C-alpha cells in the first residue's frame, strides 16, 4: 500500500533502485555459485574471500530490507495491533518512539521485529545477522525525495502512519 503515501513515479523509481541492487547481487552470485540460495547468516560461514563476503553482505541485506519495505504498509484501520498497544500503552506511543528513533538517521532502515522491537540500521553488513524484520521503513533519500523533496519528516510521518502493525508478532 505504498500508493497511500507515495506517487506511482516515486514507487517505480524506488523499485528500479532495488532492482539495480538485486542485479548487482545476481552478478556476484553468478560468479560465486556458493552464494546461490544463501541467506545472510550463511554469508558468515561460507568460504569466501574478504572482498566477496563484504560485497555480498552489503547487497543481500539491502535486497531483503527493500522486499520487507515494499510489503510493510496498509490502508489504516484502527486498532491495528493489540500487541503494540499492550507493549507500549498505545499505537500512538509506539509510532512516536519509532519517529524519534528514525528522525536523526540520514540513511538506512528503521526495522521492526518480533515483539515490536525496533532499531535503525545503517550498517547493512550487520543488519540481518540475527533475524529478518517484520516491517521496514527506508530512510534514504531515494525512498521519498521525488514526492517529499527535503521534507523528510513529512515522509516519515506518512510512512509510519501506514505501517501494517498487524504483522508484528511475539
Where are the language model's segments positioned?
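Feature for soluble, non-membrane regions of globular proteins
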Residues: 1-170
